[in-house]
């Protein structure tokens, strides 16, 4: 099976990595689809995020990283995905994710959405939280892959560098 895992990944967190690693085992092929959303002001360009994800997932078999704009269902069709993968950190994520799943299903009734619970040790992580911690010089090496931590520290000129 081919799973499409869409998101902004700005930046990629260890929570995202956990989901990608587990999905690669479960589904075989995982397409990490980086959304280029012109209405948002990302910390990293789409190209930088793709580089970070490719570097962080290089050890995994069956993981492909692509960019997309527009509807997730169109990206899924373009890449022959069998399902859309979404992560849930808490019940508060579920309502929004369920609404997206229903919307996607209304656009393509052959495409399923599969929800995976985030591992407990990563359930507090969000890209926004990571950026905020990095912006104020806090330790982020336990929150993101090493390359992402280095990029964030360069971006925010943080005194903290990961080991």
Swiss-Prot record:
Give the binding site residues for ATP: 8-9, 16, 87-89, 97, 122-128
What is the uppermost EC class here?
A: transferase
Query: Which residues does the record give as substrate binding sites?
Result: 8, 40, 72, 86
Q: Which Pfam families match?
A: CTP_transf_like (PF01467)
**Which reaction is recorded as catalysed by this protein?**
(R)-4'-phosphopantetheine + ATP + H(+) = 3'-dephospho-CoA + diphosphate
Record's InterPro entries?
Cyt_trans-like (IPR004821), PPAT (IPR001980), Rossmann-like_a/b/a_fold (IPR014729)
Residues with site note (Transition state stabilizer): 16
What keywords does the record list, in alphabetical order?
Answer: ATP-binding, Coenzyme A biosynthesis, Cytoplasm, Magnesium, Nucleotide-binding, Nucleotidyltransferase, Transferase
Instruction: Report the subcellular localization.
Output: Cytoplasm
Which pathway does the database say it acts in? Answer: Cofactor biosynthesis; coenzyme A biosynthesis; CoA from (R)-pantothenate: step 4/5
Catalytic activity, EC: 2.7.7.3
Q: Which GO terms describe its cellular component?
A: cytoplasm
Cofactor dependence is on: Mg(2+)
Q: Answer yes or no on keyword Metal-binding.
A: no
Q: What does this protein do?
A: Reversibly transfers an adenylyl group from ATP to 4'-phosphopantetheine, yielding dephospho-CoA (dPCoA) and pyrophosphate.
- Indicate the family of this protein: Belongs to the bacterial CoaD family.
Descriptive protein name: Phosphopantetheine adenylyltransferase
Q: Which organism is it from?
A: Synechococcus sp. (strain CC9902)
Q: Which lineage is the organism of this entry classified under, starting from the top rank?
A: Bacteria, Bacillati, Cyanobacteriota, Cyanophyceae, Synechococcales
């Amino acid at each position: 099976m081919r799973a499409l895992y869409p998101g902004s990944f700005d930046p990629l967190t260890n929570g995202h990595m956990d989901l990608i690693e587990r999905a690669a085992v479960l589904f075989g092929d995982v397409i990490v689809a980086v959304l280029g959303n012109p209405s948002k002001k990302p910390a990293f360009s789409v190209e930088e995020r793709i580089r970070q994800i490719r570097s962080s997932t290089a050890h995994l078999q069956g993981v492909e990283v692509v960019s997309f704009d527009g509807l997730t269902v169109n990206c899924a069709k373009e890449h022959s995905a069998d399902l859309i993968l979404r992560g849930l950190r808490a019940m508060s994520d579920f309502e929004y994710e369920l609404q997206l799943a229903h919307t996607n299903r209304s656009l393509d009734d052959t495409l399923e959405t599969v929800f995976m619970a985030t591992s407990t040790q990563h359930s507090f992580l969000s890209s926004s939280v990571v950026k905020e911690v990095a912006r104020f010089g806090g330790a982020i090496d336990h929150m993101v892959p090493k390359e992402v931590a280095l990029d964030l520290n360069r971006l925010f000129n943080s005194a903290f560098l990961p080991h």
